[in-house]
Amino acid sequence: MAFVRIDTGSEVRTLMQSATISGASSVGTPSSTLNLEIPRDVLTPSASISVSLLEMSGTGSDLARFPRDGGELALDALQNGGIDVVVVPIRYDADGSGRMPDTSEGAMNALRDQLLAMWPVSDVRLRVRESVSTSTTVAPTSGQAWGSLLDGVGNLRQSDRAAGSEYYLGLFAPAASFREFCGRGCIAGIAPLNQGNYQSQRYGLALGYGDEDNRFSAIHELGHAHGRPHAPCGGVSGSEPGYPHAGGATGVWGYDFRNDRLYDPSTKDFMGYCEPQWVSDFAYLRLHQRVVSVAGGSTLSWRLAPHHVFRVAPFTAPSWTGLVEERVTDASDGELTMMKARDRFGRDLGWVGARRVETSLPGFASLLIPDVEDAAFFETPSGQIYRVASSGESALHPNPPDDSNVR
């Protein structure tokens, strides 16, 4: 029998579990081990734990306890505030179908539960926004179309005046089924690779067919929006340089509380393209650090100012997509792209430093350029022009009230 003693600082809780075990124990064989589920309410920052084993027959051993000195181990449990996800249903009008993604209660509960199972959070506050529509045709591998819709989600986040902690996740269904759309390969999602923790870049876009593959895609894109690059598996581009486990493996045992499933350390990290997937210790820690930064309030002290956003894509001129409120950067943020601001007559308004935010799709990025009064365009030292438009052309449009999909 196993006894687990947990001292929360205000109470002592004892948990017990018994089993008959013969032979050596192995982590990957649950029947060979004793397993207890610890209630979340006792995992406080001040909690400490001790474990002892008692042989039901026989004399037992004084060494069958942890810590062996008879003391307690401080858990150093951390609270990080959880995450806020706003799902944006996008009605697909390009083929005349008016097709909606699956944002049913069951699908959203499954997405929330999978985030809770994989990410270092104890709370996922997920809501479904009113739907919008698009007439943009999205082919399975059309990076330009995906980039256009992604910009629309980002602009929507800005026009909604979303809370700083909210991550917008656009979902859409460009074909009748995932198999029909992706049978010969496809882009399944795209998001800014938000390594700079820019408030305006907390959004992403994914297919919304409601199955487990699509949930993994959505969570993968939320990972990018939290600053996570690709794990090195499956021919990804721009993989994490310091990823510690060969082949993009998780490197540690994983556990899914929803079904008591264990994931072998050879399982692949969810930020790669290989299967099966779970979350690595490496990604888990870094996601926690980002969630703490966002939800813990460290971003509240940022000084915000208007920034122009330009979409950069292969084989096309930079396009202005709108204005966002973003933090004022300085040299400590890393490399800046210096640009000359000019008015509509070409007169010099001074230098500004722009930030480039890559997306998960190679070659596609956003450029954040601080606004300058009367600026009509910005010019790089090499002569490339970034022209400000009076208004951006969005790929997303509001739906009539009866098409809304709110929960």
Where are the regions that the model predicts?
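Extended low-complexity, serine/threonine- and proline-enriched intrinsically disordered segments
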Residues: 1-14, 111-112, 116, 121, ...
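Short, aromatic- and glycine-rich surface loops/edge beta-strands on solvent-exposed regions
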Residues: 2-4, 44-66, 339, 371-395, ...
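Solvent-exposed serine/threonine-rich low-complexity stretches and specific carbohydrate-binding patches
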Residues: 8-28, 130-133, 347-362
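Extended acidic/polar, glycine-enriched regions
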Residues: 8-82
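Active-site-proximal segment of zinc-dependent metalloprotease catalytic domains
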Residues: 9, 18-20, 24, 40-43, ...
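Short beta-strand elements
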Residues: 57-94, 386-407
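Preference for solvent-exposed, low-hydrophobicity sequence contexts
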Residues: 337-363, 379-405
